[in-house]
Regions:
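C-terminal helix-rich "cap/oligomerization" subdomain common to oxidoreductases
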Residues: 16-38, 111, 315, 332-372
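N-terminal Rossmann-like dinucleotide-binding module
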Residues: 18-88
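Predominantly a Rossmann-like dinucleotide-binding segment in NAD(P)-dependent oxidoreductases
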Residues: 40, 52, 168-254, 364
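N-terminal secretory signal peptides and thylakoid transit peptides that target proteins
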Residues: 2-23
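Hydrophobic residues in well-ordered beta-strands that form the structural core
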Residues: 46, 96, 137, 162-164, ...
Length: 372
C-alpha cells in the first residue's frame, strides 16, 4: 500500500472543521500563556519615609510577589527622589502631604501604606480613602477608638479595604502559638504572660503624647495585646486592671508613661499579665495550660525569634521577612476583594483594650469591664 492510499480524503467539511480547531488553538494559546503567568503586582505608595519605612518596608518590598512600590508621599523631597531612584518609579509619583490628593489620578497606585506618627494616622488614612486607594495603616491604628471609627467609616464609604500593619500574624512562630493553643495536649492556654520593652534614650516623637497618643503601650504594648489575641483565637478580654510604675526619668517622659503593666481577664477564666516599658529590656511571650506550654523569646523582634514548648524546640528555617509576607497577603486580599486577616476592626478592638488599660491605671488600678 502506498502512502497516498493511507491518507483519508480531505473533504470540505473536515477541512473547515480542522481549520476551525487550529484557529481556536491559536487563539487560545495566548490565554494559556497568560494563565501560566502570575497576575501583575499591585502598586503601593508609602506615606511617610521615616525609620520603619526605610529600615523595614523598603527591604521587604524587594521581596514581595504581589505588590511593588509605585510612589511615595513625603514631606522631604530628597527622600522621595532617593526612593524613586532605588525602586524605579517616576519622580512625578513623588507627592507631598499637601498634594497627596493627586494620587487619585495615578492608576499605578492601588494601595497606600500610612507610616506616620500615630496621631496623624486618622488624617492620612481618610485622605487615602478619599483618593480611592486601599489603605494599610501602621500600628497602633489610631490614638482613640473614635479615630478608629472614623477611619473605618471613611474606608467603607469609599469602598476600599483597610488593614493594620500587624506583622506578628505573618510570622511562623506565632502561627505555631496559634496551632499549639488548639492542640488538646497543649492548649487551650489558661495563663499568658510576657512583655516588650527597651530603653528609649534619644528624644523623639514616641515620647510626645500629642504625636504618639501615649508611651510604650501604644508603641510596644500593642504587640502583647496582639499575641494574646493570637493565642486565644482572637478572644476579647472582659475586664482589665492596670498600673503605671513610677517614672525613673520623669524629665524625659513628661506626659506619657514610662512603664505600665496590666492584667486581662477572659470569659473562660484565662488570665494574661503583660508589661511594657521605655526603660528596660523585655521581649518575651509565654502561654501555659495544665497540659503544656509555649514560649517565644525573643518574641516581638523583626527577626531572630526563638521558641520552645512542652513538645520540643520550635525552629523555622530559613527566616522569613514578616513585612513582605504581610504586604503580599494584604495585596492578595485586595485583588480578591476580601478582608485581610488584620482588618481595621481588629485595630479598633485593640484600641478599646488600650483605652481600658489607660483608664484603669489613671484610676489607681480599678477593674475596667470591656464592652465591644
Amino acid at each position: 500500500m502506498n502512502s497516498a492510499e493511507s491518507v483519508p480524503a480531505l473533504t470540505r467539511r473536515t477541512f473547515i472543521s480542522q481549520a476551525a480547531l487550529g484557529a481556536a488553538a491559536v487563539a487560545l494559546a495566548p490565554q494559556v500563556r497568560a494563565a501560566e503567568l502570575p497576575p501583575p503586582k499591585l502598586g503601593i505608595a508609602i506615606l511617610g519615609l521615616g525609620g520603619y519605612a526605610s529600615g523595614q518596608l523598603a527591604p521587604a518590598l524587594k521581596l514581595t510577589q504581589n505588590v511593588q512600590i509605585t510612589g511615595v508621599i513625603t514631606g522631604t523631597p530628597e527622600k522621595g527622589r532617593n526612593w524613586s531612584q532605588v525602586f524605579g518609579f517616576p519622580e512625578k509619583a513623588i507627592y507631598s502631604y499637601d498634594t497627596m490628593a493627586r494620587i487619585a489620578d495615578n492608576p499605578t497606585i492601588d494601595l497606600v501604606y500610612v507610616v506616620t506618627p500615630n496621631a496623624l494616622h486618622r488624617e492620612h488614612v481618610i485622605a487615602a480613602a478619599k483618593a480611592g486607594k486601599h489603605v494599610i495603616t501602621e500600628k497602633p491604628m489610631g490614638i482613640s477608638v473614635a479615630e478608629c471609627d472614623a477611619m473605618i467609616a471613611a474606608c467603607r464609604a469609599a469602598k476600599v479595604k483597610l488593614s493594620v500593619g500587624y506583622r506578628l500574624h505573618f510570622d511562623p512562630y506565632f502561627a505555631e502559638v496559634a496551632r499549639l493553643a488548639k492542640e488538646k495536649d497543649v492548649g487551650p492556654f489558661q495563663k499568658l504572660s510576657g512583655g516588650f520593652g527597651f530603653t528609649l534614650s534619644q528624644p523623639q516623637w514616641r515620647a510626645e503624647k500629642k504625636l504618639a497618643g501615649g508611651g510604650p503601650l501604644m508603641d510596644l504594648g500593642i504587640y502583647s495585646i496582639q499575641a494574646a489575641g493570637i493565642a486565644t483565637g482572637e478572644a476579647v478580654p472582659v475586664a482589665i486592671t492596670a498600673k503605671e510604675q513610677p517614672k525613673k526619668r520623669p524629665e524625659f517622659f513628661k506626659d506619657v508613661e514610662e512603664t505600665i503593666e496590666w492584667m486581662m481577664e477572659y470569659a473562660d477564666g484565662t488570665r494574661a499579665d503583660f508589661i511594657t516599658s521605655y526603660n528596660g529590656g523585655i521581649n518575651r511571650f509565654r502561654g501555659e495550660s495544665d497540659k503544656g506550654w509555649v514560649q517565644i523569646e525573643p518574641a516581638f523582634s523583626y527577626n531572630g525569634l526563638q521558641g520552645d514548648s512542652s513538645k520540643g524546640k520550635i525552629s523555622f528555617e530559613p527566616a522569613v521577612n514578616q513585612q513582605a509576607r504581610q504586604l503580599d497577603h494584604i495585596a492578595q486580599c485586595v485583588r480578591e476583594g476580601r478582608e485581610s486577616d488584620v482588618p481595621g476592626e481588629m485595630g479598633r478592638r485593640d484600641m478599646i483594650i488600650v483605652e481600658a488599660i489607660y483608664t484603669s491605671a489613671a484610676q489607681g488600678g480599678k477593674r475596667i469591664e470591656i464592652k465591644v
